[in-house]
Amino acid sequence: MVVLSVPAEVTVILLDIEGTTTPIAFVKDILFPYIEENVKEYLQTHWEEEECQQDVSLLRKQAEEDAHLDGAVPIPAASGNGVDDLQQMIQAVVDNVCWQMSLDRKTTALKQLQGHMWRAAFTAGRMKAEFFADVVPAVRKWREAGMKVYIYSSGSVEAQKLLFGHSTEGDILELVDGHFDTKIGHKVESESYRKIADSIGCSTNNILFLTDVTREASAAEEADVHVAVVVRPGNAGLTDDEKTYYSLITSFSELYLPSST
């Protein structure tokens, strides 16, 4: 087994979710299709609720910002109280959500609605989050060694908490010290990692970031964050240069903490 020694100054391990803690197949084949298949029914059921209206308002604002994009789907403001008007608006939201998802967009508006839909599904027991078998034992070991563990994902903080609170391993939220999403910045921007360090109250070089995406790893490195690229089944392939340049692990168990000996 290849062992990657964690630098002595590291006190925080920052984890990506998709392709790192959780199989991409779970996200691509279960989580995202659930949204596309159920968004219309969800909107019709929850439309009158304040939370749903806030979600729609945020999506409408995003649609206005996207108006210049090819194929952008507008969301009209309500023009009356008629049933036809309501159904047209719901369909516009459905079309907008599906358009954004077809482009794999990570807008806060989209992520917020997805998070609320997943909350309804997880709390109703309609799905449980999947984690790679090495994740929970490794995170427990890190915490016993005094490490802080944080999550940084393009999925909303609320969605992250749902995954860790309703997993096949049970409720494992207690293993996580905190959560970050795109509200702090995008994962391919180095400034996001500086903001995360400020929020945690540490230096960027006290953080080890584990991700499967090399663009994110590069952005983190620019901020003086330590990185390791996680190679998992189903993840995008790496170039020969990337394989040579980055520290690679295929399991969290391959991390060696000098402080734990």
From Swiss-Prot:
Pathway as given in its UniProt record: Amino-acid biosynthesis; L-methionine biosynthesis via salvage pathway; L-methionine from S-methyl-5-thio-alpha-D-ribose 1-phosphate: step 3/6; Amino-acid biosynthesis; L-methionine biosynthesis via salvage pathway; L-methionine from S-methyl-5-thio-alpha-D-ribose 1-phosphate: step 4/6
Enzyme class: hydrolase
Residues reported in the UniProt entry to bind Mg(2+): 16, 18, 212
InterPro entries the UniProt entry points to: Enolase-ppase_E1 (IPR023943), ENOPH1_eukaryotes (IPR027511), HAD-like_sf (IPR036412), HAD-SF_hydro_IA (IPR006439), HAD_sf (IPR023214)
A GO BP annotation: L-methionine salvage from methylthioadenosine
EC numbers on record: 3.1.3.77
Cofactor binding mode and count: Binds 1 Mg(2+) ion per subunit.
Entry annotated with the keyword Hydrolase: yes
Binding, substrate: 153-154, 187
A Pfam cross-reference name: Hydrolase
Family the UniProt entry places it in: Belongs to the HAD-like hydrolase superfamily. MasA/MtnC family.
Main function: Bifunctional enzyme that catalyzes the enolization of 2,3-diketo-5-methylthiopentyl-1-phosphate (DK-MTP-1-P) into the intermediate 2-hydroxy-3-keto-5-methylthiopentenyl-1-phosphate (HK-MTPenyl-1-P), which is then dephosphorylated to form the acireductone 1,2-dihydroxy-3-keto-5-methylthiopentene (DHK-MTPene).
The protein, known as: Enolase-phosphatase E1
Species of provenance: Homo sapiens
Gene expressing this chain: ENOPH1
